[in-house]
From Swiss-Prot:
Biological processes annotated in GO: pyridoxine biosynthetic process
Subunit structure: Homodimer.
Reaction(s) catalysed (UniProt annotation): 4-phospho-D-erythronate + NAD(+) = (R)-3-hydroxy-2-oxo-4-phosphooxybutanoate + NADH + H(+)
Locations listed in the record: Cytoplasm
Catalytic residues (UniProt): R209, E238, H255 (proton donor)
Function field: Catalyzes the oxidation of erythronate-4-phosphate to 3-hydroxy-2-oxo-4-phosphonooxybutanoate.
NCBIfam families: PRK00257.1
Binding positions (NAD(+)): D147, D233, G258
Main localization of the protein described in the UniProt heading: cytoplasm
InterPro entries: D-isomer_2-hydroxyacid_DH (IPR050223), D-isomer_2_OHA_DH_cat_dom (IPR006139), D-isomer_DH_CS (IPR029753), D-isomer_DH_NAD-bd (IPR006140), Erythronate-4-P_DHase (IPR020921), Erythronate-4-P_DHase_dimer (IPR024531), NAD(P)-bd_dom_sf (IPR036291), PdxB_dimer_sf (IPR038251)
Protein name: Erythronate-4-phosphate dehydrogenase
GO function terms (MF aspect): 4-phosphoerythronate dehydrogenase activity; glyoxylate reductase (NADPH) activity; hydroxypyruvate reductase [NAD(P)H] activity; NAD binding; protein dimerization activity
Taxonomic lineage from the root: Bacteria, Pseudomonadati, Bacteroidota, Bacteroidia, Bacteroidales
Length: 348
């Protein structure tokens, strides 16, 4: 079995080389028809577009993307060509929740926002959105949920309309997949009409897909004061991001909200397990991220501990200083562990 692997997928080499007869590692953007022609499987990230132009005439039978999102896979073509694909749902949900929690603490510190007096609207309540809701409730924030597919499927009254969330929420955070058309279209879900309906002074966060928010409409909302702040981890036209938007946001990061080592290890494990199931391979391997240098966090408050473990301002400062290095900052991301890797002692 021959497998082509994105060379930025961590913790995979030892395991995949036990499984496959031949493994080739390549940058995600450099996957070509010639490279994949005689491969049996691909293990990719979002930078590899898997469609007819890449796959036609190849031997590829299986694709695993080590990501939650799968809009870079032409699923209709894969179905037509008999290619099985899989993603890694929920792999980095705790990582995104960590990013949101730290960002909320930054807003509290720097903007005087009293979190226990705020209402947050969570748009998209899957694996990630559910974790974010848990974090918000733990911090004493009132939570409103919007998820039209779930609302219709479950016939539940727990969900609010997007209009209601826009009008009532102090903070709105997006955790939806990208659908460019259809009943549940999310492309430019936050457009000028959405921003004009917002509660004045609201904060917008996006860690889902850049195209969920219309950039020019977001910029106008920031210029006019409709929004007080924005936190943007995903951008339209990545890696060629809008520099005015980067300058205006309080936190702007290079698509790394889900990039904890724990989340990456989960994604790699899920991709390998799916590969082994498809090819009916039995193997025994463990994928664990490196330990942090200092596992003991001793500080006066939980807020301080959270920001000691992960402070997104470091990533934001790096991108704002070097916006042309978007892909490099993302590809060479330093070790970041989640809270469970530490022992936290609150001294106050």
């Amino acid at each position: 079995m021959k497998v082509i692997v994105d060379n930025k997928i961590p913790y995979i080499r030892e395991a995949i080389e036990q499984i496959a007869d031949e493994v080739i590692y390549a940058p995600g953007k450099d996957f070509t028809p010639e490279l994949v022609q005689d491969a049996d499987a691909l293990i990719i990230r979002t930078r590899t577009r898997c469609d007819r132009s890449l796959l036609a005439g190849s031997k590829v039978k299986f694709i695993a993307t080590a990501t939650i999102g799968f809009d870079h896979i032409d699923t209709a073509y894969c179905r037509e060509a008999g290619i099985t694909w899989t993603n890694a749902p929920g792999c980095n949900s705790a990582s995104v929740a960590q990013y949101i929690q730290s960002t909320l603490f930054i807003l509290q510190q720097t903007r005087g926002m009293k979190l226990n007096q705020m209402t947050i609207g969570i748009v998209g309540v899957g694996n990630v959105g559910s974790k974010v809701a848990d974090v918000a409730r733990k911090l004493g924030i009132q939570v409103m949920l919007n998820d039209l597919p779930r609302e219709e499927r479950e016939e539940s009254t727990m969900f609010a309309s997007l209009k209601s969330i826009a009008e009532k929420c102090d903070i709105i955070t997006f955790h939806v997949p990208l659908y460019k058309e259809g009943k549940y279209k999310t492309y430019h879900l936050a457009d000028k009409h959405f921003f004009h309906s917002l509660k004045k002074g609201a904060v917008i966060m996006n860690t889902s897909r850049g195209e969920v928010i219309e950039t020019e409409a977001l910029l106008e909302a920031l210029r006019s004061g409709i929004l007080s702040d924005a936190v943007i981890d995903v951008w339209e036209h990545e890696p060629d991001i809008d520099l005015e938007l980067l300058e205006k946001v309080i936190i702007g990061t290079p698509h790394i909200a889900g990039y904890s080592a724990d989340g990456k290890a989960n994604a790699t494990r899920m991709s390998l397990e799916a590969l082994c199931r498809f090819f009916r391979i039995e193997t025994d391997y463990r994928i664990t991220p490196p330990e942090p240098k200092n596992k003991l966090i001793s500080t006066a408050t939980y807020e301080e501990a959270s920001l000691m473990i992960y402070d997104p301002r470091r990533d934001s400062d790096a991108l704002k200083s070097h916006p042309g290095l978007f892909e490099q900052l993302r590809g060479d991301y330093p070790l970041r562990r989640e809270e469970g890797a530490y022992r936290i002692v609150i001294t106050k």
